[in-house]
């Protein structure tokens, strides 16, 4: 029995035919209400009404209509209807709780719009509610309106059909009901006006001591005083909805197109946007924040772990230098002492993240040449020591292209920086320590382990980060003891430039040729550059062939981090660089970096499982289909491939650089679009869903808010100038499906190209054709004739002229615009306008 699946909680009220019980589903744990309708002693009319309510609810799906779960007829003669539970109670009780204190106008209009959207949905389904009142309007925990109690609703076959049954609540009944006149959807508009008036004044719109006086007040059309605490637009809208004549009342669709209503909807969406942002901040959902905010926070966290070392006894200094093309923050400056952690953090945080014209760093470091027998081992260790941290940081900041060109030159030139440990800035690679005293790298190992779980800071030295902006330290740093001429003889300038062009897409990173820097700063061994470029291209082609080494290389990297540290070699004589050994070292380094790239793919694959969609994966798939086998890798892989080889991108190879910048810009742009769509609330739905959490009732409430925001956004986009309110049909006849463009009001406003194709109607026997079909066919033929004769633009102007109040002026202007066609099409245009305003198909 279905009732056994629910756990009884309490009775929450009594409806028209039975009681309403709050229950809890045993499986999903959600709360529902079961409406038990006693049909044992009910009349045939009441039985039909109860069955109709269950049938209607099962077909209706709208954010502002009570949700339907299931229904069944028990053996005890009761009809059970399971519906969603509205924790806020009904609107009537909510207004009573105000105790005479008026609601804010935005709250009144918010509820008003939600009730109107529910009525519009019902009317599009050809359903009259016929008992709309504040007791049948419910509120959820998040103040979302739910219209319910469709027990006496009636489904009309056509909009021109009228219902003449005298049912409803007297306070909300329209004058035509008491006069026993036919009525249609305008009766629900009257009831809607009564509800809005009650929300605004906390009183019934029409009230009297007895029923006779109440009926007399409604029939005579004596309007109650309009509320003065609200704007005149709202008062005028209430007055039109409570017009005595049904034809003078606006339809629900026209109500939602009023400029005042659309303005209030925009205010509601803006307030929801702000509330969503606060919820995102409160819940700490970093994915719902804008991408720039996340990156900014990451950049700050990278500087929190900076611990300055004491100065050496030699009095070495750190210089901050800049090129002429840099901005104001890149101007040359020098500091005799290292800054404190607070000053360092303040300095780095002042970097302009929106700067798009910064250049990369130009760094000069001391170079130590390893002995021939120890080059391979130290080079491998140097790469493996730095690579895992770089990989983790790449996984943390997917849109950042990090280009470590000093690292490249040191590896390819078989060199290694040797600065005093006291001069070492920890944001650089922790493996670059002095070689003069042969101190191990062990003192800096805890910093590596501390950075990984905390902020995954990028530790390659010196690094360039491009994510639409230059995120890392773009100030130019030069490390080394400059107080003696001997130290200057050991300095070889290792250079790299990263131009972030203003006219390029945000985040575009282009690697320029090394020779563009001042020629005095070129390294001594630049003669091996062509071979290194070929090696780099060969390495990039080999990256796609080592997927099988992912896990093994990853374990080797972690195992190496725990191995004993190696001592740095002593200073050799500068200039004795063996090109053959350098190439051999490049081969060894290529194997290590290739394995590291494979491990980065594994880490990327594991991290991509945490997100529903990955822009990098989509971009990678698209590139694999469009590009040749030599196409550039995605953002993170491109960063690693640049960090591995020791030569910047050649100028005769612009295509891989462009692919790299395209990867960077597209990935960042998609992330920003995703977050902005969350902030703009037309796509704010996923942001709200994340902020509220995917747990039980919170997720259900979030989905309801998302659906409401989507619906209000669609309502806000309705054209207020459209006077043709064609309601779509649930199941239109096939012959009209082919020609819906003639009923679409977009064609009347020039938004759809006019097509003058002829309509061929399928002949139906008149015996089986209902009256509504005949009228529909006539209107279609009339519309086709008018559009052909006048055209879309002229017909739109004629519609505007027909709105003129002065009849004489209207006819004169119609003659001027229509010219010769006035005699033939003036009457047809009036007829078409009348049918489109008063009949819905």
UniProtKB/Swiss-Prot annotation:
Gene3D superfamilies hit by this protein: Phosphorylase Kinase, domain 1 (3.30.200.20), Transferase(Phosphotransferase) domain 1 (1.10.510.10)
What happens after mutating residue 777 to K? In a colorectal adenocarcinoma sample; somatic mutation
Cite a single Pfam family from the UniProt record.
Pkinase
What molecular function does GO assign, one term? ATP binding
User: Known CDD domains for this protein?
Assistant: STKc_Nek4 (cd08223)
| Reactions this protein catalyses | L-seryl-[protein] + ATP = O-phospho-L-seryl-[protein] + ADP + H(+); L-threonyl-[protein] + ATP = O-phospho-L-threonyl-[protein] + ADP + H(+)
Q: Which residues carry this modification: Phosphothreonine?
A: 165
List the expressing tissues: Highest expression in adult heart, followed by pancreas, skeletal muscle, brain, testis, retina, liver, kidney, lung and placenta. Present in most primary carcinomas.
Query: According to the UniProt entry, which residue ranges have a biased composition of type Basic and acidic residues?
Result: 541-557, 607-616
Any Gene Ontology CC annotation:
ciliary rootlet
Give the protein's cofactors.
Answer: Mn(2+)
Q: Where is the Protein kinase domain?
A: 6-261
Active site positions, chain numbering: 131 (proton acceptor)
Here the segments flagged for biased composition (Low complexity) are 591-606
Q: EC number(s) on record?
A: 2.7.11.1
Residues annotated as binding ATP are 12-20, 35
**Localization per Swiss-Prot or TrEMBL:** Cell projection, Cilium; Cytoplasm
Provide the family line: Belongs to the protein kinase superfamily. NEK Ser/Thr protein kinase family. NIMA subfamily.
**Subunit and partners:** Interacts with RPGRIP1 and RPGRIP1L.
This molecule's function is given as:
Protein kinase that seems to act exclusively upon threonine residues. Required for normal entry into proliferative arrest after a limited number of cell divisions, also called replicative senescence. Required for normal cell cycle arrest in response to double-stranded DNA damage.
* The name this protein goes by in its record: Serine/threonine-protein kinase Nek4
Gene behind the chain: NEK4
